[in-house]
Amino acid sequence: MANKRSLKKQIRYICGDLAGECIFAREIIPGIDHDKANGIIIDIAALQSEALAKTTFAFDKSVRDFESRHAYRTARHSYFKNAYKTLLNEFNAGIDAILKEMNGLLD
């Protein structure tokens, strides 16, 4: 992601689309359990709020802790890269679990 704002927008769009699809399926497709669909929508909302809360993190070291500015920038870059990668992996795992639940509604 280019910045935190666009990452948060993408998280909101993805979760909103999933919730919309679940509501659409609940209302249009006969035989879908409304309680399970509502539970999935609640899970989507929880995933969204958790992911948005995790987007804010800070590098806890200062320039003085390193030998040079280059070492500081390198360490800071790798820290944020790993943090965003972890956030995206957790978010994608949550999305996969929700999609499996949504597909289970159709059985």
Spans of model-derived segments:
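Low-complexity intrinsically disordered segments
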Residues: I40-I42, E50-D107
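Short terminal alpha-helical segments
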Residues: N3-P30
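Short, surface-exposed loop/turn segments at secondary-structure junctions
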Residues: M1-R5, I28-N38, T74
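Short amphipathic alpha-helical segments enriched in hydrophobics
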Residues: C22, R26, Q48, L52-T55
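Alpha-helical segments in soluble extracytoplasmic regions
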Residues: I14-D17, G31, D35-L47
